[in-house]
Design a protein with these regions (language model features):
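Conserved small/polar residues in nucleotide/adenosyl-binding loops
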Residues: 1-5, 269-278
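Early transmembrane hairpin of solute transport permeases
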Residues: 4-57, 64, 68
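Alpha-helical support elements that line or immediately flank enzyme active sites
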Residues: 19, 204-222, 261-267
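Beta-strand segments within the central parallel beta-sheet cores of soluble alpha/beta enzyme folds
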Residues: 29-34, 223-234, 271-274, 280
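Signature of multi-pass transmembrane helix bundles
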Residues: 46-189
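Glycine/charged-rich beta-loop-alpha catalytic/anionic-binding loops adjacent to active sites
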Residues: 185-196, 236-246
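Conserved phosphate/anionic-ligand binding catalytic regions in large, soluble enzymes, centered on
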Residues: 194-208, 252-254
Length: 280
């Protein structure tokens, strides 16, 4: 984690940000609204508090165990396997929640055995869009917002604005630039939320932003954009399923393949609809 407009980075900064400025009711957006005053408070907390990070080797790839103390009181929370999976809660030695964890099992996650290209295509083109609107609208809104912030602000290497400056405003350049700008902003302190794919913000940005840019460029309807995003997201998930939740293989590669499938989907469907109108 990197906190914007500061040199605070890493797990210690993330823990301090959650303690000082976290809003538990916002779930995965727990530190989305950190103010400049809270940033100063986080710095002060880091200066005054001994935060220790240790590597745990227990067969669980994604495993976070947080223990805090104040005076005579203590509390411990454990998250394992995936980001919202709280498996242990303890306060002053009293165990309040205790769910066994067996390695990297994903039995509690969605069954992906039905995912293949034929079923993905059929689902994306036949589902009632009202059933998926509440999932896809936040992805469009949030991911476009952080990409636009990345293009406006000074984040990381500013790859998005560099691409636009050097290669022009062609749709192919914009598709790359928006994804890069969103990633630069996300990884360099922008607190705006990102709708993820396969547990990853960069995969969520890569799977969605190029598709949105292409759909807007060709004037595709909102429905066609939804269906193209379904193709992109599900292809990304399908490819990622064979890799595993955490891997040295960069998941953005899978998301790039998903984006290519989504762009092809919206282009093909939009042109087919346009040809039908011409024949009429």
């Amino acid at each position: 984690m990197c906190i914007r407009d500061s040199n605070m980075k890493g797990l210690e900064a993330a823990a301090a940000a959650g303690i000082v400025a976290g809003k538990q009711e916002k779930k995965l957006e727990v530190i989305a609204d950190v103010t400049p005053e809270q940033t100063k408070a986080i710095r002060a907390y880091l200066d005054q508090t001994d935060i220790k990070v240790r590597h745990v080797e227990n067969g669980v790839t994604f495993d976070i165990i947080l223990t805090v103390w104040k005076g005579e009181h203590s509390a411990q929370v454990r998250i394992a396997v995936f980001h919202t999976n709280i498996v242990h809660v303890e306060k002053d030695g009293e165990v309040l929640v205790d769910i066994p964890v067996h390695g990297d099992s994903e039995e509690t996650l969605t069954d992906r055995s039905l995912l293949d290209m034929e079923h993905i295509w059929d689902f994306a083109n036949t589902v009632d869009v009202e059933d998926v609107r509440s999932i896809l609208e936040p992805q469009i809104r949030c991911n476009m917002a952080i990409a636009e912030e990345g293009l406006r602000g000074n984040y990381g290497a500013n790859i998005g604005s560099v691409l636009l400056d050097m290669e022009g405003n062609d749709v192919r350049v914009r598709a790359k630039a928006y994804a890069a700008a969103g990633s630069d902003a996300r990884m360099n302190g922008c607190e705006q939320p990102v709708v993820i794919n396969s547990g990853s913000g960069n995969q969520g940005l890569t799977a969605s932003l190029p598709v949105i840019i292409y759909a807007r460029d060709m004037g595709a309807s909102r429905e066609l954009l939804y269906r193209a995003l379904l193709v992109s997201n599900l292809v990304t998930i399908h490819l990622k399923t064979g890799i595993g939740p955490l891997s040295a293989y960069c998941g953005a590669t899978s998301a790039g393949c998903g984006a290519g499938a989504g762009i092809t989907s919206v282009s093909y469907t939009h042109l087919r609809a346009h040809e039908t109108e011409l024949h009429l």
